[in-house]
Amino acid sequence: MLDLKFIRENTELVRKAVAARNTDAPIDEILELDSCRRTLSQELDTLRAKRKIIAKQRDEAAIEEGRVLRGRISELETGLSEVEEKLTDRLLRVPNIPDASVPVGKDESENVVLYYRGEKRNFSFTPKPHWELGEALDIIDFDRGIKLSGSRFYILKGEGARLQRALIAFMLDLHTRKHGYTEIYPPYMIKRECLVASGNLPKFADNLYHDAEEDYWWVPTAEAPLTNLHRDEILSVEQLPIHYVAYTACFRREKMSAGKDVRGIKRLHQFDKVELYKYCKPEDSFDELEKMVADAEEIADALKIPYRLKQLVTADISFGSAKSYDIEMYSPGVDEWLEVSSCSNCTDFQGRRANVRFRRTPEAKPEFVHTLNGSGLALPRVMISVIENYQLPDGSIVVPEVLRPFMGVDAIC
């Protein structure tokens, strides 16, 4: 969330930032509501002061005037509460300001490829897509997934389930033992205020699964609960930076047009992901972003799968992000670069929404922390890349060397 004072004093900058994102935000309405709020607050202060003076008087005229004032004050308090509620809602719908280093672009087609790592495999045969390989090996069952839950669900069986478990264990081990992240296992159902703090609500409610009776929300990503671990807390500077990693299932409606990405396990209502999350001092956040990208890339390097790094343009960075990078793995069976990680610096956007602050000294005024998030990495697209890059002519799949200690086998046949 942007600071209201910042919007008031930098209105044109905010308008330009919103335009650069190729989106809209209720800036005019925010300014009108802010003006109304201040007018009502001033009138209330005046009437309350007058009521205190009149309360000391005992004549009938003063008593009558006091009664009238109480009624007017009650009306103004109700009106002010309604205005403040609307103002908060509109502020929650304004995206973060892109950093000056982010290229301006109208959509994802203008994202900038920064570099490629690894070489595409030179196949002596035509590589098959993962759905053909998975069904032939009986490690992915699409029909029974649909029978249980409908479209965009699937079942992993046998070595397929073990492969995913091996990937998750490998990623968690690398991030905790080598990169120094603290592992968290959060709830999959969280309160509404958690998703407001993370930036998913109110703007993206239509893409989330919700239990209306209990008002619980299924996590779209572990970023949401991790944002809230320190909600309404004041941290000491010695506690920063804080690095968390969490594995969760993720739940999204993923409303897609018919015919797009309908085959395979690329786009689903439920998928698994290892998430990286950081709290840090404002002056450190962009360095922490580069480190997070390197931590995520190390997974792709270890799996020996070709990948590329993209910097996202202003119109493609997420709602809460000030700067983002995407890591995309190459998958030869579908002949696509698949996004397996998006790493973002949200500056103080989530810190302000979640009210997470820190003090530089015990006597210092609290400041909002900066937060960062990134996939480290996202399944099942990593599964797709592993299956398709490591396939053999007979349809079997070689298990990447780093996964063999977790799998206990060298190949899936």
Curated annotation (Swiss-Prot):
PROSITE patterns to which the protein is assigned, alphabetical: AA_TRNA_LIGASE_II
Ligand binding (L-serine): 221-223, 275, 375
Gene Ontology, cellular component aspect: cytoplasm
Reaction(s) the record says it catalyses: tRNA(Ser) + L-serine + ATP = L-seryl-tRNA(Ser) + AMP + diphosphate + H(+); tRNA(Sec) + L-serine + ATP = L-seryl-tRNA(Sec) + AMP + diphosphate + H(+)
Chief site of localization: cytoplasm
Entry GO MF terms: ATP binding; serine-tRNA ligase activity
Stated family: Belongs to the class-II aminoacyl-tRNA synthetase family. Type-1 seryl-tRNA synthetase subfamily.
Function, as annotated: Catalyzes the attachment of serine to tRNA(Ser). Is also able to aminoacylate tRNA(Sec) with serine, to form the misacylated tRNA L-seryl-tRNA(Sec), which will be further converted into selenocysteinyl-tRNA(Sec).
Assembly notes: Homodimer. The tRNA molecule binds across the dimer.
Domain comment (free text): Consists of two distinct domains, a catalytic core and a N-terminal extension that is involved in tRNA binding.
Record protein name field: Serine--tRNA ligase
Species lineage: Bacteria, Bacillati, Chloroflexota, Dehalococcoidia, Dehalococcoidales
